[in-house]
Design a protein with these regions (language model features):
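Short, positively charged
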Residues: 1-218
Length: 218
């Protein structure tokens, strides 16, 4: 290991460059493990270029806005990214044949989801705790905020604020937190969905530009 100087710089690009040299020489091999009976390894971030997913559409619920607490970004080849509380706010990326990983969003703009949002130029995203406290302490204000996001999302403007309260008044806090966060986020992602999906996909699969070369157990 004396051939590699990891102390020369704390910057990730430099460290990743040294790890790339060590991997090519088979001196250091990082491995991402999973519990399985049959192991097949795939090289990640080594020579083969990353294949970006292609964004196709988004929806605030597969049936309608009020029927579910989640929202989806869809991509080509049956790719979908589901956002919801479970019980923490998170995103799960699901492909046609396999699940590709999760990202947490509970801590707002400083969470993994928040980091991806920052990567596309978005600087605000509330924490789930902030929204939960608002629901508990200022319920009317929360519904006014949710209704504003609902209208900004292009949903049915014939639905009034009172209609929304009647439809969602009996939903628990976790449901409301989820719906607000995903609607807030989708409104700010308008026009940036492709870049967000690409960055989130890379992050969840440990194939981001900051990720080092490694073997992944499939």
């Amino acid at each position: 290991l004396s051939n590699y100087d990891f102390s020369a710089s704390p910057a990730l690009p430099y460290i990743n460059q040294e790890l790339m040299k060590a991997y090519a020489a088979r001196d250091i091999i990082g491995v991402s493990l999973k519990k399985t009976t049959r192991v097949k390894f795939k090289q990640i971030n080594y020579k083969k270029p990353f294949k970006s997913p292609t964004y196709t559409k988004k929806t605030l619920g597969k049936k309608n806005f009020f029927a579910a607490k989640d929202g989806y970004l869809f991509g080509a080849n049956n790719l979908e990214m589901q956002f919801r509380t479970f019980p923490a706010f998170q995103a799960e990326i699901i492909g046609g044949k396999a699940k590709h990983g999760k990202l947490s969003g509970d801590s707002g703009i400083n969470s993994p989801i928040g980091k991806v949002l920052q990567g596309v130029g978005i600087r605000e995203f509330p924490t789930r705790t902030e929204i939960a406290n608002l629901i508990k302490r200022e319920n009317d204000k929360f519904f006014e905020m949710l209704y504003a996001e609902y209208l900004n999302a292009g949903e049915d403007s014939k639905v009034t604020l009172d209609d929304m309260k009647k439809k969602l008044g009996k939903k628990d806090s976790n449901w409301l937190e989820s719906k607000y966060l995903v609607t807030f986020m989708f409104n700010r992602l308008q026009g940036k969905e492709q870049k967000f999906l690409e960055l989130a996909y890379r992050y969840a699969k440990s194939e981001s530009e900051d990720s080092c070369v490694h073997l992944k157990a499939m």
